[in-house]
Amino acid sequence: EEMPFNRAQRAWVYRAAKNLDNTQPFGSTRDLRPPGTLLFANATFPALETATGPTSPLIIGPECAQPYASASFFNISAMSYGAISKPAVLALSNGARLAGCWMNTGEGGLSPYHLAGGADLVFQIGTAKYGVGDGQGGLDEARLREVAAHPQVKLFEVKLSQGAKPGKGGILPAAKVTPEIAAIRGIPVGQDSRSPNRHPDIADTAALLAFIHRVRTLTGKPTGFKLVVGDPGWLDELCREIIRQGLSSAPDFITVDSADGGTGAAPMSLLDYVGLPLTESLPRVVDKLVEYGLRERIRVIASGKLVNPGEVAWALCVGADFVNSARGFLFALGCVQSMQCDRNTCPAGITTHNPRLQRGLDPQDKAERVRHYVENMRHEVAIIAHACGAATPRQLRR
């Protein structure tokens, strides 16, 4: 019951999503003694409330034809329609619009329900290229342009790997491949939807940069990539290749996913043993970008088990520009951590396509909970920032 998220972590999200007071009496229940415990250094003279202000927008891809400016440092991470249900996607897309944050489509393509909410969208290009593929493992430029023509689609994210299963492609079980989902993805109905373990046309760093440049040129929109860091030495190779080719070759952002990410079901051998956790990888990515003079060119997005204000504030301190969460938003929708995500039997109606189980998930009601979760997250991260002497959360430093 206490793993992977303990009762206190879940309770904070539930209360925040319901817009309830999260004030607690009688001291912390968190054990502050273990080495490595996350603690913030409060300022002797903290920032006065009169000196604080709203978070300013950050621009992603300023050199693009259509750069994107976002003021929200907390956003919805990648979860595809198929992995989660129609009412869940509707609730998230509507809630994201209300909260003024973005929503990542996940690798399953662009569905009508992503668009219905009116939120800003990040279109993820997974290894199977669902929705923009040519059927042979390559990119269909015409289909890509069709997706980019939607004004709601603001960014494109090339997925190299994800926290739950670095080195392995995504799997959507046959029970969840409905006719509608099959049509959106361009796959057979009622068969397992399996993505390759990597993009067939991206075999090295130069090819990655070339692919990003191609997508950005075709769409006119900021393009980056998502990965779980394995070998930190590869970061040097990436930075050197960018410098060799010129700054115009650089990705507009890098999404650093933690090895303990987990919206996708995966073999336990990958869940438990492969990839670096965000506590190890995020500082390395930020430091390498600074070392090579690329930090101002490339935005950094952190994801992976960041569901409470302290964890989000930590990521901003370390150097992330934005934080994405997936499971935090599942809790906001009513997830009870029943661990049935891949079985089409989710009792909360979030990861099932069974209409009977979906009846308890009202998209309008849950959209408000998504909104409250984002707003309360931003508010409490700001409280931490002010206690540390920072006027806004993005001024936090390690």
Can you name each region flagged by the protein language model?
Residues 123, 129-131, 174-203, 264-279, ...:
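Glycine-rich tight-turn/loop motif centered on a GG-T
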Residues 106-108, 221-226, 251, 295, ...:
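Flexible, glycine/charged-enriched surface loops at secondary-structure junctions
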Residues 1-42, 273, 284-297, 307-313, ...:
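Alpha/beta catalytic cores of nucleotide-metabolism and tRNA/nucleoside-modifying enzymes
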Residues 1-104, 108-118, 124-164, 173, ...:
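Conserved, well-structured core domains of diverse proteins
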Residues 75-85, 127-137, 169-171, 195-204, ...:
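Active-site mouth loops of central-metabolism enzymes
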Residues 90, 99, 150-153, 172, ...:
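Internal alpha/beta core interface subdomains
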Residues 148-173, 232-233, 237-252, 256:
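Carboxylate/His-rich catalytic cores and anion/metal-binding grooves
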Residues 194-358:
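Glycine-rich phosphate/ribose-binding loops and adjacent secondary-structure elements
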